[in-house]
Regions:
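Acidic surface patches and DE-rich sequence motifs
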Residues: 26, 125, 176
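Beta-propeller and closely related beta-pinwheel folds
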Residues: 1-118, 133-152
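Polar low-complexity, Ser/Thr/Gly/Ala/Asp/Asn-rich disordered segments used for subunit assembly
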Residues: 153-189
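Conserved, well-structured core segments that form or line functional sites
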Residues: 120-123
């Protein structure tokens, strides 16, 4: 399906995620895409696209957690949580970094999600430091933290290995731009 979004700007699509509806993040705003009704399929003749916010997204994959989508804003310094709000009967995207703006000040290059044993959104900053956001929306828990492992990782690729059946550990693998990898295992008790 090729469809032109009625908008006053032409922007590249940065991410697509599925929560309550299909969410499109562009460089200029965030949109919901549906089939026009509850549980209706999107077809060439049955499509409804609504703009939800004007923040704009960076070219970093968004993360769907439950009914929310966490995405990096265009300047790569703010993590936003796009979620449906019954009070406004639409989606809102509050700034998740508002109480810890210093932690993402240098910008983020990527994000990934760890579901077990704790729900954490991991990110690599532009200066190479590893940061995390402990995130449990249903409990209203958001806590930022930095992790310094005795070095900086620059343009690292971060992979969080999810051990759903092993409650006592999480392994983080960082792959540097030159291809070398460093593995960290964190045991929880």
């Amino acid at each position: 399906i090729i469809y032109t979004i009625a908008s006053n700007q032409v922007n590249a699509i940065r991410f697509m995620t599925a929560t309550r509806t299909l969410i499109l993040g562009t460089a200029g705003g965030e949109f919901t895409v549906s089939g026009g009704g509850t549980d209706s399929a999107v077809t060439p003749t049955n499509i409804l696209i609504k703009k939800q916010s004007n923040h704009g997204a960076a070219n970093v994959d968004a993360i769907a957690v439950g009914n929310a989508t966490l995405f990096l804003q265009r300047a790569k310094r703010k993590v936003r949580e796009l979620a449906y709000n019954f009070d406004v009967d639409g989606y809102i995207a509050p700034d998740m970094t508002i109480l810890a703006e210093h932690i993402t000040e240098s910008g983020l290059t990527q994000m990934t999600y760890q579901q077990e044993p704790n729900q954490i959104i991991w990110g690599v900053r532009d200066d190479g430091e590893l940061i995390g956001l402990t995130y449990q929306r249903e409990q209203q828990v958001t806590a930022w933290h930095r992790h310094i492992f005795g070095g900086r990782f620059g343009n690292a690729t971060i992979t969080v290995t999810d051990y759903a059946n092993i409650v006592n550990g999480t392994r983080i693998v960082l792959t540097k731009a030159d291809g070398t990898t460093t593995t960290f295992t964190s045991a929880t008790s």
